[in-house]
Amino acid sequence: MKKNRILSIVLALIMLPVTAFGAIDRKEIDSANAKFQKTKAESGELKEFSRDLNLVIDKVDVTKVLKHKPMAINGSTSVALRDFAERIGAKVTWYGHARMIGIEFGKSHVLIPVDKKAMWVNGKIIDMKIAAKIHGKTSTTYIPLRNIAEALGYKVDFEEESFTARLTSQQKTK
């Protein structure tokens, strides 16, 4: 009985780093964070659209199943990151020590710092026009839709008339 308990504890401790960091390891997070320190910070405000934005992913309208409505940051369409990522089947992890979100989707590994105009995509820094922001009332992180969608292999089209963003997968995830 005592051996089983000790074995369980040892296995849990061995697996902790794997489950906590998945395919994005601490070294990669620290490396990205060091590079993000050189990136310009931004102060943009989240604002609601005057009308509801429709979001269609691979021909499926997900507008009504989103927990948080898309919003605008400095005029750029932004989505709640976890909400969007979960709709496409991506894994999301918050790295509080670095104020950074990690996303794993197929072969894509993305790290997104809050309030920085850049993201880390498969080991490369990609500049963004707008930084990811945390909505004060809901503690939800918003990121420009086009940036995250393209980083995860989606083509983005916007239809002004119907106020619809259409995302089409351009890669196989498995």
Q: Which residue ranges define each predicted feature?
A:
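Sec-dependent N-terminal signal peptides of Gram-positive bacterial secreted proteins and lipoproteins
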Residues: K2-A23
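Primary recognition of N-terminal secretory signal peptides and signal-anchoring hydrophobic helices
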Residues: R5, F21-K174
